[in-house]
Amino acid sequence: MDQTTHDASAYDFTAAEARWQAAWEARNCFATADAPQGGRRKCYVLEMFPYPSGKIHMGHVRNYAIGDVIARARRAQGYDVLHPMGWDAFGLPAENAARERNVDPAKWTRDNIAAMKADLKRVGLSVDWSREFATCDPEYYGHQQKLFLDLWRAGLAYRRESAVNWDPVDMTVLANEQVIDGRGWKSGAPVEKRKLRQWFFRITDFAADLLAGLDTLENWPERVRTMQRNWIGRSEGAEFTIRLAAPCGGIESVPVYSTRPDTLFGMSFVALAPDHPLATAVAAANPEAAAFIAECQSAGTSEAAIEAAEKRGFDTGLRVVHPFDPSRTHPVWIANFVLMDYGTGAIFGCPAHDQRDLDFARKYGLDVTVVVAPKDDPGLAVGDVAFTGDGVIVNSGFLDGLDVAAAKSRAIAELESRGAGKGVVNWRLRDWGVSRQRAWGCPIPMIHCEVCGTVPVPEKDLPVRLPDDLPFDRPGNALDHHPSWKHVACPQCGAAAQRETDTFDTFVDSSWYFARFCAPHAPVPADPAATSHWMPVDHYIGGIEHAILHLLYARFFTRAMHRLGQVGVAEPFAGLFTQGMLTHESYRTEDGKWLYPEEVIRHADHATTLDGRKVIVGPIEKMSKSKRNTVDPSAVIARFGADTARWFVLSDNPPERDVEWTEAGAQGAFRYVQRLYRLARSVAADRADDVALERAEGEARKLRQATHRTIAAVTEAIDGFAFNVAIARLYELANAIAETEGRDAPGLPAARREAMSALIRLAAPIIPHVAEEANAQVSPEAGLVVNQPWPVAEPELLKRDSVTLAVQIMGKLRGTIELPPGADAETAIAAAMAEPRIAQLLEGATIVKRIHVPDRIVNFVVRP
């Protein structure tokens, strides 16, 4: 449905939305002080800031509409509200654009920001745009460089050699996830393993705190907390050395970590990570081992890739001596499923009690010895399924007869007494490598001098700015190819030196931006007074895909800044809300070409292209550019208005669930927006009477009760992020108002005006433009809706004049009765028996029992 201009009663959303957005901006309605002094409660609402790709999508609309509803409602409820917006502006897409299209990444980014900002403004967000910044602003990344130096001086940032995935064509380091089947995700070139000196943040210093802090985050989804607990990965076990039967390359023993020292007597083999020092020593003398290691390294190095890959191994020919029984030796294998950066990079395999070890042992014909048996099956034999449950230790010498927990303690004590090992707590979490060989990022403010070593850039020289003329005409890091930027004098001795040419991982940029928003123009990274007032963020809103990395890094950064005395809180986000995705059918032609929804005509039982060709309709799935099943918000807003888009993305499902975009749903939302405006015009045209609201009876009182119940219900629903429930209640109130149109009852005009005023203010956080337009019809003297207080329900009107009780006979519903709330059993039973249909059904029967559930049920148990 396109906007109807010939109907004088229709809401002209195009003109109205522009008019009210201009009014809000002119009056600075959403500006907030850095540290307000009014003593009011604060509410910091923040949606994860976007990457400036150039166009917003409907997922953005849903994400920012959720935050906007909360921000607008809290502002109306009397809170000081901070609701800022910025741009996560560094990253690979801008650099790719520079290389592929010969455009300046800064200009490309700024142009995209301008386009997306205009789009977001059209959505009508209650954002304090005076706080806007982009992470590529030198002022912002200069403060980030200052933070880095603070962390470096505190020992929380350091540089060391690290194995990396190197793309020889793009000449850059790739994350594990960017290695696909051993090749670079972009270049397709075979990836090489190299060792480079990289910068790291010592996040492991905070592992215990980060884990314990999750228990305090009661307003986070449990799913996210569980994901972070697993990522941090605390485990208790034993770290011990296993002696090689014969040294290899100067190595005499292998350190091993295990959470199951109780199963040591079930050891069948030792497995090494492909990049373990002993594996390297074996490969130096064994070409077959070297080839196997190269295969492992090219097959994908992410945990997901390793987990999915077939479990393979290489027998080194080495053997180790069992730590408890020197008469036993076991083979040493190199295995593709062992990770060097977890534990010690070596494991002992106990196939009977670990499924992965069992699969490996069966594949290569290795021993399987049961050492834990169920209490009721001491002779357990393991087939193709490992026994991983609790039980009694068997076939284990001095551990026999103990339960698993006691055996763990006894095994650790024995290792300690022999000087071979000890009990330890291990963490899956590893220090965060933040070096990236990319030019379009925040420069790391360090200088390398052959005389002084690595030294910091003096703070007076911050920010270290990116050059304006980055050379993207050759592979590799453009900063390496910019001699006048790269070559500098050492700030300590004056000798010739070189800048650090690595830039920060963009996750660093988003790990503290929420603190900067509190006072974005302050001369320090995080202003103490402002962060003291606003932090933590009360409502942080974004996708579940950020559950681990971004959210964990932000928690680390906040704790590090707290340790340094820069912020007063240890946790950045008191509340976290992860919204669902927007979904849509996908469409393609018979030759496999994907189509946009606007290129398809849906018929009753099939679909065609605009020129009549057959279209294959695919499943409803996440909107994606690759499948073209996206809906352009700009087109939706032009056709239906921003309020329709906002209403629809919040109305169909709970916001934590996915929502399917449908034409019918958009049409329904559009009709409601139009209806609200028409209702306002109708109420504005009512003739007043002399009956005060407080004395309203009959139909007027009934409408007042509906109004105040809606106020209570919508308030509760918005507090609980149940926007679809709030919208359902708003539909009901609109229906209640419409049902009274044209009726002449005492007090009804005032009750209708009260109801309409409440409906406008309750709907305003969701559909703010039409709310302002409707308010101008009904209550122009009240001023902007955005400045009006939230309606408050009157307790007296929440009480029901009557309740409906179900009347049952033998548990089957036979009728209903209306009674005053709280009617006693005698009254309820008498009323039920007086109901003609019930009396007829009871006639001739003997009532054995009368059951009364107050305000709910009357039930008669009878016999003929």
Curated annotation (Swiss-Prot):
Short motif 'KMSKS' region, span = 622-626
Matching InterPro entries: aa-tRNA-synth_I_CS, aa-tRNA-synth_Ia, Leu-tRNA-ligase, Leu_tRNA-synth_edit, M/V/L/I-tRNA-synth_anticd-bd, Methionyl/Leucyl_tRNA_Synth, Rossmann-like_a/b/a_fold, tRNAsynth_Ia_anticodon-bd
Query: Which GO terms of type biological process are on file?
Result: leucyl-tRNA aminoacylation
Q: Which GO terms describe its cellular component?
A: cytosol
* Reaction equations catalysed: tRNA(Leu) + L-leucine + ATP = L-leucyl-tRNA(Leu) + AMP + diphosphate
Q: Which residues bind ATP?
A: 625
Keywords assigned by UniProt?
Answer: Aminoacyl-tRNA synthetase, ATP-binding, Cytoplasm, Ligase, Nucleotide-binding, Protein biosynthesis
EC number(s) on file = 6.1.1.4
| Motif position, 'HIGH' region | 50-60
In Gene Ontology terms, what is one molecular function of this protein? Answer: aminoacyl-tRNA deacylase activity
Entry annotated with the keyword Transmembrane helix: no
Does the UniProt entry include the keyword Cell membrane?
no
What class does this enzyme belong to in the EC scheme?
Answer: ligase
Q: Name the protein family.
A: Belongs to the class-I aminoacyl-tRNA synthetase family.
- Per its UniProt record, what HAMAP family does this chain match? Leu_tRNA_synth_B
Q: Which NCBIfam families does the entry link to?
A: leuS_bact
Protein's name in the database: Leucine--tRNA ligase
